[in-house]
Design a protein with these regions (language model features):
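Non-catalytic surface loops within mature trypsin-like serine protease
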Residues: 49, 78, 107-109
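C-terminal terminal-subdomain/extension
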Residues: 1-17, 92-141
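Compact nucleic-acid interaction/catalytic patches
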Residues: 51-58, 63-95
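Short alpha-helix capping/helix-loop boundary micro-motifs
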Residues: 26-33, 49
Length: 141
């Protein structure tokens, strides 16, 4: 994961936090390294900071489903978190330094294919299953 400092919101390529998608989105695991982002893949996009949405940074996001023509994704962090809102994913190919990652379960981001900076990796099916279990416990279908 990149630890580069904050940067201003880009004219194109920023993700948007969405609410209430839990009942609309169907969780899906369908990675396909075809150059397009699919559920089960870790991608990178510009994510705004919570305290100042005009500033943010490129972050890894796990694509968990689709809502129409938009992807739905959850943010990863390399900083340890103990809260029930975070799921320990361990390390993966999305982090070149091999650091463990935590997935934020309480914030869903919507992004268009064109908003992606790059694709990172495919999450193993059993790890995606853990994500699905955690999200279904929160009302996802």
């Amino acid at each position: 994961m990149s630890d580069h400092g904050p940067v201003a919101r880009p004219a194109h390529g920023a993700v948007t936090q969405v609410h209430g998608v839990e009942r609309l989105a169907r969780l899906d695991y369908s990675p396909d390294l075809d150059g397009l982002a699919d559920p089960g893949e870790v991608v990178w996009a510009w994510v705004p900071f919570e305290d100042d949405p005009a500033v943010g940074k490129d972050r890894p996001l796990l694509v968990v489903g689709r809502a129409g023509r938009f992807l739905l994704a959850l943010m990863l962090s390399s900083k340890p978190h103990d809260s029930a809102d975070w799921l320990d994913l361990g390390s993966g190919a999305w982090d070149h330094d091999g650091r463990p990652s935590w997935l934020r379960l309480d914030r869903v981001y919507e992004l268009h294919e064109n908003d992606l900076r790059r694709e990172g990796a495919v999450l193993a099916p059993e790890r995606f299953g853990r994500v699905v279990d955690a999200l279904r416990a929160r009302g996802w279908r």
